[in-house]
């Protein structure tokens, strides 16, 4: 039955944010999801078998194996008895998972839920659409799962999501200079927050195996590697005379964030 008890967040964690083909290239999305789940459940101080269900957003599912959210749950130390649902919603999948988890708790369907999101754009595979039927003769296409199912419009084939940002910039008259200034300030704030340790409490470090041994990643990769003096000279990313550059757009990244609510 529906509960009148307040719904509260009892634990939260995220991995560092990795760059495209960067520190987390060897890890699948469910590896990152598992790391975030494990940390958040530990921080909540609850028994893993008390979690009723995992709801995790993940839009680029191809190539990961069956049920990525369930794999993340196992890697996060949750038992086989804990159910899991992987859901897809462009950009807002993790937030949608959290909303739906809240609603299940309000409805009284569950007592404890795990919710969050995970993505690894680096590991999104290339697709052979005609592979099952066979290629008869001549050249054909392979499709980028990241672009086709994540970053391109489904209704105007091949149109990048970034071009809609250009439409907004034109409509609201955001100049290149304004966007560059905003990007620079944003990176500076992220760098300052990292240096001061402001993000440390929310991040769970992730250990990555490399050819040189194990490396522990504990800070966000993008801000640490950003070159602010290069921003003003970057070429437009989506149209020849556009105002949006690689510095202004949302980065292509790999990470997972997760909360436990009850």
Q: Each predicted region: which residue ranges?
A:
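Active-site-proximal alpha-helical scaffold in enzymes
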Residues: 89-119, 169-198, 253
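Single conserved hydrophobic/aromatic residue that forms the stacking wall/gate
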Residues: 254-262
């Amino acid at each position: 039955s529906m509960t009148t008890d307040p719904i509260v967040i009892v634990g939260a964690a995220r991995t560092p944010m990795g760059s495209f083909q960067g520190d987390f290239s060897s890890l699948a999305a469910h590896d990152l999801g598992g790391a975030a789940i494990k940390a958040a459940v530990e921080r909540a101080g609850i028994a893993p078998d008390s979690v009723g269900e995992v709801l995790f957003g993940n839009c680029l599912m191809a190539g990961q194996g069956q049920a990525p959210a369930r794999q993340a749950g196992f890697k996060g130390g949750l038992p086989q008895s804990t159910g899991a649902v992987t859901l897809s919603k462009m950009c807002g999948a993790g937030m949608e998972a959290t909303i739906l988890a809240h609603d299940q708790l309000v409805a009284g369907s569950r007592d404890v839920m795990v919710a969050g999101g995970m993505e690894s754009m680096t590991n999104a595979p290339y697709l052979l659409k005609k592979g099952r039927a066979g290629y008869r003769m001549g050249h054909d296409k392979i499709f980028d799962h990241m672009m086709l199912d994540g970053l391109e419009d489904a209704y105007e084939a091949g149109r990048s999501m970034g071009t809609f940002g250009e439409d907004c910039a034109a409509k609201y008259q955001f100049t290149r200079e304004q966007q560059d200034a905003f990007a620079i300030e944003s990176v500076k704030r992220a760098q300052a927050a990292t240096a001061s340790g402001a993000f440390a409490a929310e991040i769970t470090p992730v250990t990555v195996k490399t050819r040189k041994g194990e490396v522990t990643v504990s800070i966000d990769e993008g801000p640490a590697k950003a070159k602010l003096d290069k921003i003003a000279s970057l070429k437009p990313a989506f149209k020849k005379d556009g105002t949006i550059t690689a510095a202004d757009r949302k980065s292509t990244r790999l990470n997972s964030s997760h909360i436990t609510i009850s």
